[in-house]
Amino acid sequence: MEKLKQQFSKDRLITPSSNLVRNYIDSIPVDLLIDILSRFPPKSIARFYCVSKLWESILRGPDFTELYLTKSVALRRLFFALKVNTELLVFSSPQPQIPDENSSLVVEATPYKCFPKKIPTEICTALGGLVFLGTFLSRQPLVIVNPLTGEFITLPKLKTIGTKRFSFGYDPISKKFKVLCVTWSPCGTLPNIHQVLTLETGERLWRTIHDPVIPRYSINYDAICINGVLYSEAYYQGSSKIVCFDFKIEKVSFVNIDGMCNLRLFNCKGKLGVHQYDVQSRNEKLVFHVLEDAEKHKWSKSICILPSVVSGKRIVEITCTGEIVFSPSGGSLHPFYIFFYNIERKTYTRVQIKGFKKYADCVHTFLDFVEDTKLI
């Protein structure tokens, strides 16, 4: 917060001496003020935190946040995190409207210049306007960043002993971001420890989840949060399963996956999709499963033949309009393309993203990123 205040202190819209102007603005009815402020672009909203305590309170409130994000649905963006040597670069671009026929589009990616660069980057999750960063080594710090404002926080360390996996999610009921830590002991006999940190104002503390049915299991690195449920591949009782952690009720459950393993998890129109990764496959045929009913362990299976242009690309997501989105995972990024392939029409759109550096060690691509002005 202090960093943000210093950044805008020189060019505030209302200076400390403008008491009459501030008093007049603060006399505007709150409902009207919320509506007026919701019409401004994100960068302007970030400046308004410094106008007055009333404005800061309004901008932090759930009513403004919900209204602003609702209006921002049409402003969803593509978000990219690039690792170049030890430096992390983040960009976003407009998320294009996909035409009905084969086509090529070009969009310009703009960097977030105030994003801190020298921070852990092995784990990268963009969710709801925030970015969660960390490493697989528990001694390294975990960081949550708002790329629009440049504000970031370092999460408190845990004292539990054992192998840890951290995941980032969102609880749509309480409208709060949460971080899950799963720890399993090195001795191999004790049940896993589940701890949750809720991202909110005030002191940030890890809470241990006391669930008597939690067994011992090990989880893969890949995890995805969909509609408040965190999914990841797990190894439990000698077989591969999907472990589900519901952030809304903070409970663990498992879903059978019929012998599949080495899975890539993705969002498929608001449901969990899994694709069995085969390093020798050239992606000429895509076989994926969609979780239809977690309680009944019910999956649907789809097979589609892919065009050669997406061979070797990584699945990012299947959009609500039915496009499979593919992105390169790293290497040469000049030029950099992502592909939208429509399963029903069998058409693809190649989107060139301009503005990247030529090479990167890895690149993370996210859809439907909405810039959020709310401070952490």
UniProtKB/Swiss-Prot annotation:
**Which InterPro entries does its entry note?**
F-box-assoc_dom_typ3, F-box-assoc_interact_dom, F-box-like_dom_sf, F-box_dom
Top-level taxon of origin: Eukaryota
Q: Which residues form the F-box domain?
A: 22-71
What is the protein's given name? Putative F-box protein At1g53370
